């Protein structure tokens, strides 16, 4: 019951963020202002350029980070890093931030399938040229299923679904005496529109946009879609 309620609430909030993004954005920022007070520069430090859920939203249990800021235990600096210095970091505005430890939490580049060079029957296979079957299997790539979770829900929710699918697929293959399984475009799929792995209007963090050219394509038909929707996939 608790799991279903959480999933329902997440789905409802995501849907509302897409249907009425400006209202949701105003409400979220309003809650931040309520914690930090009228004198805090929320416009600079807590007003992103993107609409809600086009990039990840940080959940703050009981407003603990805002309480820490108000108590002087934490502070926010919104800037770009110019370089590391002997004492910490210097930003592009010239401010030096002293630091004992620097934890990199953004700006990374994705590593897709471990940068493995796939060779199928002696022919190299370029992963980005493949088309995904429901975001888990790929044309021209036999006996492989990629475990890729949800952006807006627990990653393991989709892992669960994929594990169940693999078990059913293996049982079916054993029954048929098959040792190889591979998805392929049908004749009626040959002219379907091919789309990026994720629609940039749906989800567009920098690390994903920088790596989109490495990822497979999805199709405009349901079988070749990558929905990121737990209830539809379940």
Segment roles from a protein language model:
Residues 1-63, 137, 200-234:
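Flavin (FAD/FMN)-binding glycine-rich loop and adjacent Rossmann-like elements that form
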Residues 5, 132, 143-234:
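C-terminal, flexible cofactor-proximal segment of oxidoreductases
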Residues 18-174:
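Flavin (primarily FAD) cofactor-binding/catalytic cores of flavoenzymes
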């Amino acid at each position: 019951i608790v799991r279903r309620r959480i999933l329902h609430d997440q789905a409802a909030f995501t849907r509302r963020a897409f249907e009425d993004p400006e209202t949701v954005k105003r409400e979220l920022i309003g809650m931040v202002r309520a914690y930090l007070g009228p004198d805090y520069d929320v416009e600079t430090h807590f007003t992103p350029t993107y609409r809600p859920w086009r990039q990840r939203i940080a959940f703050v249990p009981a407003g603990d980070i805002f309480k820490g800021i108000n108590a002087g235990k934490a502070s926010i600096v919104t800037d770009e890093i110019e370089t590391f210095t002997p004492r910490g970091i210097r930003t592009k505005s010239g401010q030096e931030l002293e630091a004992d430890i620097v934890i990199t939490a953004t700006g990374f580049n994705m590593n897709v399938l471990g940068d493995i060079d796939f060779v199928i029957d002696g022919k190299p296979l370029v992963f980005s040229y493949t088309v995904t079957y429901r975001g888990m299997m790929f044309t021209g790539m036999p006996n492989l299923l990629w475990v890729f979770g949800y952006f807006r829900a627990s990653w393991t929710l989709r892992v669960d679904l994929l594990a169940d699918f693999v078990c059913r697929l293996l049982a079916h293959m054993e029954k048929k005496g098959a040792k190889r399984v591979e998805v392929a475009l049908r004749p009626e799929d040959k002219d379907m529109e091919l789309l990026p792995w994720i629609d940039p209007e749906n989800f567009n963090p920098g690390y994903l946009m920088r790596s989109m050219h490495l990822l497979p394509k999805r199709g405009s038909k349901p079988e070749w879609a990558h929905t990121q929707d737990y209830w539809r996939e379940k």
